Design a protein with these regions (language model features):
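C-terminal edge and immediately downstream basic/flexible tail or linker adjoining helix-turn-helix-like DNA-binding
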Residues: 45, 58-74
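Major-groove recognition helix of helix-turn-helix-like DNA-binding domains
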Residues: 52-58
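Acidic, proline/glycine-rich intrinsically disordered inter-domain spacer in sigma factors
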Residues: 1-16
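Short alpha-helical "packing" element that flanks the helix-turn-helix/winged-helix DNA-binding module
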Residues: 14, 28-29
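Helix-turn-helix DNA-binding module
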Residues: 19, 23-27, 35-52
């Protein structure tokens, strides 16, 4: 039971943090991790080149980590 509650809480924090990302970054995270798409399909959906897709994904991960870090330290 405690594990389930902890998982629900962690997922809620993640959803909240994802909602705070810019739309393109949120979609990149979604396509890459939550609804895995091949890179060619994900970059096409975002209208990006391959390098642009990976740069957007990197920015999204960095921003997401910072948001989650701020939430856990405040």
């Amino acid at each position: 039971m405690a594990d389930d509650a902890h998982r629900r809480e962690a997922f809620a924090r993640l959803e909240s943090a994802l909602d705070r990302l810019p739309e393109r970054e949120r979609l990149a995270i979604h396509l890459h991790y939550l609804d895995p798409e091949p890179v060619h399909a994900a970059k096409r959906a975002l209208g990006l080149s391959r390098s642009g897709y990976y740069k957007t994904l990197d920015r999204a991960r960095t921003r997401l980590a910072a948001i989650l870090d701020r939430e856990t330290t405040s």
